[in-house]
Structures are given as C-alpha cells and as structure tokens.
C-alpha cells in the first residue's frame, strides 16, 4: 500500500510539474504579428496612410494610367481597396479576418506593374509603418508579407 501511494504521488507530482512547465513555455511563445502590430486598428491606420502616400507617389502610377486596367480612385473605390488591404494584412499577420478579395495574380492582371513600381510601393509601406513607430522586427515581417506577393503582382520586369 505504501509503495502504491508513493507511486501515485510521484505520478501526480510529475503531471503537475509537466503542466506547469508546459504553461510556462506557452506564455513565452511569441504573439502573432497581428497582436504585435496592435491589432486591426493599427493595421487600418497604417493602410489608410499607405494608400494616401502611394496614391500621391508618381513612382507608383497608382491609378495605372496608360494600362488596360486604369483605376478610378473614387471614394467608394478607395474604401474598397483599403478594406481589402486591411483584410489581407490582418489574415496574413494571424488576425481573425478572412481575406475575401481575389487572388493577387488575377486582381493585378493587366496592370503592367514593374519591379521599379513595386519597389516604390514597398518603400511607401515601409514609410507608413515607420510613421506609426512599428518596431523593426514587425516592419520586417510585414515587408516580407508584401515581398511575398511580388511574383503574383509584377508583370513587367
């Protein structure tokens, strides 16, 4: 009887210790990028600044003037674009939103975006992230998400 009791205590103590250590490890796990960015509100603020910045950047050709996919930046169109960008970044950063837009390749087809224009877009996003004091690690992760879309967006080298 004594040995069974000692064995039971040892097993129970081991289980509690394992749980305690497991919970300790879980709390040290890095938060998703979404949380580290400040959630949807911060993503929304950065996206709004980015759209304003990129639309005024002549290196970007934001309206795609002179291409088969020229875009009219009406208030409704800008609102839709911002909504899709927020959804995309939210989902890519581990947030709860689902991106409901079309895939990057089909939505940018015919826009004739060049690598130089894409580089300018990245610079504008980097500036918007910096404006709101997004830390370097998180900026780097967002920029990796953006860079990951290059192959689907750039049509003209």
Regions flagged by a language model, labelled:
Residues 1-16:
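Bacterial N-terminal signal peptides that target proteins for export
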Residues 20-24:
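C-terminal motif of bacterial Sec signal peptides marking the signal peptidase cleavage site
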Residues 25-157:
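Core of compact, soluble alpha-helical bundle domains
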